[in-house]
Amino acid sequence: MTTTTCESNSIYPVRWQDNKVWLIDQTRLPMEYGEVEITSSEAMARAIETMIVRGAPAIGVAAAYGMVLGAQEITTDQKEQFLADLTRIADRLAQTRPTAVNLFWAIERMLKVARESGPEVAVITKNLLETAQNIQKEDVETCRAIGNHGLLALPEQPEKLTILTHCNTGSLATAGYGTALGVIRSAWTAGRLIQVYADETRPRLQGAKLTAWECLREGIPVTVITDSMAAHCMQQKLIDAVIVGADRIAANGDTANKIGTYSLAVVAKAHNLPFYVAAPLSTVDFSLKDGTGIPIEQRDRAEIYQVGTTTLCPRDVNFYNPAFDVTPAALITAIITEKGAVTPAELIFLQDS
């Protein structure tokens, strides 16, 4: 049996045990905590599409394990056919969420390992599992480094900060610890945080459901606000800084993140508040010179008009439901990575680091 070990007091949304994957079902939080057993690559693809697992780094890890499950499904012992079958599995996983670049990064890393392995299919599968586990372990280490660098990047005054964040960027969105919420955790541990303001993050409410849940688990004071209250809170001087995550960052620093992020950046600029993006370098797509080339996922209209079984508004109207928006680099104070905090203009220098 090969098991992914976890610290007992931490949240790990993806767990490998007994040749299968267990995912925390994030669609059931915060009312119910439970795991979903994933035994096939197709089941993993559906779990990513339906956001049982979500967050750019987390779906990268999940996709890597989905590749392992797919490798276990392949029956041929010929490497050439194995690679052809594995590529089809990779293509299916890549179709699940088009914006988050970590997904494609992890899939390509897995395919590279398969191509460069020897001719024995059993050895290739073993190498794929080891690679998926390494991706998971590396992401936890990366998030902790982001937290440390982010702590140093925060404004020196006031000594104790109130930080606004958007969506969920914590342990649930990564392999563990978190990106933007990882910085917040580090600030809390260092005694530099008074409280967190969490946007509810319409339409799927990841801030209200998931960020608030994670903060409560760790004893971090958290206040949930509707998305439309953020500007008012800044105007009333309730916010000292804004920290968000990212799903894809272009080479110039333009950042795609959960819908509503751009609005926050605009109002933060208007109120002279620092606006930080926290993300691993695997989220940076250096092949894109700016954010105009970032694909924006369009999701089901029902996410807007319905919560659970409750209909919120007339269905017989048009709905527009982009999952992400792009914040221009000019609105971003710094991008916090595992290599340090840099301005958007300096990001390109981290490409080969």
UniProtKB/Swiss-Prot annotation:
It catalyses: 5-(methylsulfanyl)-alpha-D-ribose 1-phosphate = 5-(methylsulfanyl)-D-ribulose 1-phosphate. Gene3D superfamilies: translation initiation factor eif-2b, domain 1, Translation initiation factor eif-2b, domain 2. This is Methylthioribose-1-phosphate isomerase. Keywords: Amino-acid biosynthesis, Isomerase, Methionine biosynthesis. The gene is mtnA. Transmembrane segments: none annotated. One of its GO terms (molecular function) is S-methyl-5-thioribose-1-phosphate isomerase activity. HAMAP family: Salvage_MtnA (MF_01678). One of its GO terms (biological process) is L-methionine salvage from methylthioadenosine. Its EC number is 5.3.1.23. It comes from Microcystis aeruginosa (strain NIES-843 / IAM M-2473). It holds the Pfam family IF-2B.
